[in-house]
Amino acid sequence: MEGLEAYDYHLPPEQIAQEGVEPRDMARLMVVYREGPFRVAHKRVRDLPEFLRPGDVLVFNESKVIPARLLARKPTGGKVEILLVRERSPGLWEALLGPARKAPPGTRLLLLSPKDLAPVPGLQAEVVAVEEDGVRLLRFQGDLVAHLEEVGEVPLPPYIKAKIPMERYQTVYARRPGSVAAPTAGLHFTPELLERLREMGVELRFLTLHVGPGTFRPVKGDPEKHEMHAEPYAIPEEVAEAVNRAKAEGRRVVAVGTTVVRALESAYREGVGVVAGEGETRLFIRPPYTFKVVDALFTNFHLPRSTLLMLVAAFLGRERTLEAYRLAVAEGYRFYSLGDAMLIL
């Protein structure tokens, strides 16, 4: 296993996308092949049907981003920013706080409206415990879920400086609230493109993996020692059956995004295939991982030294991945969450 510097590349800051392309499927698409000599095709996302075939199973993550960034004030007047991680039980949330050191157990927090920073009547929280990695357990008084749209904001990645509307950071098929960041590969799909794929005989299937704040967490030091945050996933029975049937019949399983890869690979059992149901994954995919389920991957261009880039390197090969990234930089592709896409076949 190589060190962190083996997953580095140079990216001019102006190639970090600050907004999405409209229409969504007009984003550029680099098609890269895993086998044979290095070759690519430069296309648009709307050209995707050219590279898929009837019987392919295209798997999406239908998790929906929640407005997970909250502002609060302590009774002493100090401001606190809350990033919701997930609801453990009704009214009890795992969260990251900043500045965290000033919020020990027993700290009471008044939630503020992001519009005028006035306290929201009847909505407050108490820090009840501090867990590993600095995660706080917060007990909310009042119905937080009912007020989330009113008091919460989209927790955009730190490299996006512009304010973007919530719907632009949401896939068109998002249905199950729970992610604190978008499963960004899916942002490229339009209802029209999905319909074209359906009509040509591609099977569209949907699972859920709620993206946690660990997606923003950089790898520091030795990748071997990096620990992933647990993320919950759910794979419906009919999706597991469709994937297993495709594998048995020699048809391709195409993952839309790294979250789908991690959910499917986590749910795989030797001799059984993908097992339906709910679970949690801390799976960190990096070379020399052997893929059991996924045959092709549609994904964005990821940050240097990130777990996502390592996953792509495991799938495509590290040298070939970095060669493709260098070419993408030279060709002016747009990078990260709102940027262009890559299809690995």
UniProtKB/Swiss-Prot annotation:
One of its GO terms (molecular function) is S-adenosylmethionine:tRNA ribosyltransferase-isomerase activity. It comes from the Bacteria. One of its GO terms (cellular component) is cytoplasm. GO terms for biological process: queuosine biosynthetic process; tRNA wobble guanine modification. It is found in: Cytoplasm. Disulfide bonds: none annotated. Its EC number is 2.4.99.17. Belongs to the QueA family. Monomer. This is S-adenosylmethionine:tRNA ribosyltransferase-isomerase. It comes from Thermus thermophilus (strain ATCC BAA-163 / DSM 7039 / HB27). The lineage of its organism: Bacteria, Thermotogati, Deinococcota, Deinococci, Thermales. The gene is queA.
